[in-house]
Amino acid sequence: MKKIHVYLSAFLLSSLTLASCVIAHIPSNENPEDYKPAPVSNKPNSHSVKVPGVEVSNKKFNVNVFTGTGGHGHTFPGATAPFGMVQLSPDTRLDGWDGCGGYHYSDNIIYGFTHTHLQGTGVSDYGDILFMPTNGHTKDKPLWRDAIASRFAHNMEVGSPGFYGVRLSDYGIDARMTASTHTGMHEYKMQPGDSCLLFLDFMHRDKLLYYDLHFYGDTAISGYRVSEAWATEQHTYFYAVFSQPFVGNDQLMQRSKSVNEKGETKIELEMIQAFQFLFLPTEKNVLTIRVGISGVDEEGAKKNLYAEMPRNDFNYNKQKVEEEWQKVFEKAPAPSLFPTGQGLENYRTSLYHCYTVPNVWSDVDGRYRGMDNKIHKAEGYTRYTVFSLWDTFRAYHPMMCKLEPERTQDWMKTFLEMHKERGELPVWELAGNETYCMIGYHSVPVVAEAYQQGIRFKNREDELKMLEAMIATSNGPQDEKKAYVKYGYVPGDEFSESVSKTLEFAYDDFCISRYAEMIGDKAVAQQYAIRSQNWKNVFDPETKFMRARVNGGFATPFDPFQVNFHYTEANAWQYRFFAPHAIPELMELMGGKKEFEAELDKLFNAPTQTTGREQADITGLIGQYAHGNEPSHHMAYLYAYVNRDKVHMYRDSIMKTLYSPTPDGLCGNEDCGQMSAWYVVSAWNTYPICPGDYTGWWQDYEPMSEFDTRSQGYPSPFPLGIYNEKKIVPAPIITAPNRAFVGEQMISISCLNGASKIKVEIMEEGGIKKKGFFYSEPFKITKTCTILVKGLAGSDQEIDSPWIEASFFKRSGNLVMKEVGNYDAQYTAGGNDALIDGIRGKLDFRTGVWQGYNGKMECVIELKNPTNIKKISLSAYQDIRPWIWFPSNVKFFVSKDGKSYNEVYSEDFTSQQRIEGPQMHEYTATFNDKYKGDVSAVKYVKCVALPAFDKIPEWHLGVGGKPWVFLDEIIIE
């Protein structure tokens, strides 16, 4: 019998090499050409992926699974079951923001098929356990993943709920995918006579921490990978069964190049974490692979597979998942508003997207990996993962309370168990990891809304434990939450996104109050009702916008169009109306109904341009209403309070112009169902303006009972008003020209509601406390001091404000900024004197204390009194992820006349350019007795800082962009 060898000419010519047991060598008396794969025909195969039934299936569902795969939708088109753990889908993109879902419609290369994908997120992860079939005729490419990748065309690609198919044109392979909850099934139909060389990649996309692979004869394998990306430790286990035995397998090696100190190039072979399996041709030449997935272990993956896909029958398994999807669409039939056409397809596709997340996380035996990285068993419920709660608390979860009450109950139990495992309710949980992406504690409104709709925990103990979890989560351990409790707002000079955090914390506190009220805890209900009023502490009565509080006052300068780090993925326009639990009071502060309507009109009719930093999420603009991101989603429905006709006008406009069943049919990230949930709920002629509050739904036209009998209204409402809600005096506003001053400075104080009394205390340096007084008019300070103010209650129905403090520094008038560097308008750090004001930046550039330059910085400082210089220093900041690097070079010059300058210091600093994470560095020149230059009687000091690069290099994701330089204090002694 002739021994079989495999010859892969492209691999041998490229940097990719397969290890010896399969391609060991070719005997010299045999012709290598005999072992080359047959060339791929350019003609369509008779077994094209467009097989009968696929188009019919797609028309039956009226779903376009490719919606959102282009533009910035970040969706995936592959096969998944409703809420399935498995999302078996092609991977066409390895990195980049528009590659977060692993696939982008503008691509024409498939790297392989992986079993997990995120639906519409703004951060990349998943893409686990990649399989890629080839016929062995691979390409000559430097990297092995490029060598095995295949081109594809969209006219040879199809998809529908639970199914995906594509022609891999480089190999003539027709690939089909289907899935169950925990299992994915691949089918690869080869050209007649072709072998299948299948690749398995553990390294795909994420940083690989650990992996393993086990063999069970020649028809089954299992293994795992532990990876790091958005989730810092993600465990993915699998068990795969092949429909035929493989005749060879091996681990891959890849050539790597390095250059030594002498400039000599060295080429070495290194083992990589990828494997290949050879399958010989058969009569039908179809290879199927069933792959069970688990977050627990390989045994769990095996159980999942055999519980859900015991039959090696692709069409049977496909039919089963299609039946599951049919039940979904029967739960919420399209409203009469959309009987046919694009509206119907939009509605069905939106509903489909909503049912792809969250994902089942427990195995069929109930086991799951918890947030403590331990294995637990879900008793009496199903465990879930992927909770994008900052997005989904708005419309998605209120909608699912109606469509999936039992599943909502499971999600509530999941939240509670997560709290047990790590001490906090989830913020943005992913595969048992807390990513801390986004802000707020928005699992709270999900639970509060569920209770409003009659969905309960199964026992009183869990009900009370959830309240304990809410309280614990709202109070820490993060410092920003502690500051919020102390001041009634998150200070913008200490924490980033302070306005958004204050507003969302206040809303979440309202939901805690409502939940406590519903389960009968009056004390907690009243405490959090008071905290929920903190949104007023960032409302500026002059501009009528929500603004950052800095040093007791409002941050200046203020531009409502500017995108900066005081807001979460937004500007002041897009957070102006976020007080969903207090719309009548917000309306009153804006002047009443007429004025409120006028301000809404301004929102929708403002210029669409924004200023400040680039924010890819701000899309789908109608004026400054940004439908492409969640903070705006409730705003069109605010017209329900003043002019319902405009609700209809803007809702209909958004539905018709910002949604379409096309690859670029979403105006922003899908965001785990929220973008689609907005459409579904809007199609029902309703919207939850304030989830968690019985009065928080607006509805019109046809009753929701057309969709679900539970939707005729809430159950009998809980008795409201079990406590007398007191009003808190808003935090007083301390206003001054500058934080650092020369000579003297006037201080004025005001309060939003005109508090009857404002108590003032002043603490000078050295802990000297001056006599307190009640504020009556602006007053003067002449020394460095801290001012503390408190608004006092004017009646029994009011509560004193917290103590608010502001620190002011009297600096020497000897330093004057003569020529100011060209700092960016969004990173002013307070203005022209920021580099000499005595206020030092901390290890977070987003607090606004660092001054930012998008290029070279050059400034000149005048010393009023000529000085013998002993030291000059300049502080710099680096965090390479947001494109901020230390200056590559800093120079100091001195002059006696401001015309002739002598260089006294130059430092090149490039050694840290690839180090991630925030860090600071001080460029320091010390002039002692040994210094030979002249630094006496210096009148002017010039500082020059050069950016790290002209353009960001290829090794960074921001390749081609301009690096930032962030600087703070210049100290001259």
Predicted regions and their residues:
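Short, compositionally stereotyped local motifs that mark structural "simplifiers"
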Residues: R710-M857
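Aromatic, loop-rich ligand-recognition surfaces of beta-strand-rich domains
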Residues: G841-Y905, F909-S911, Q919-E973
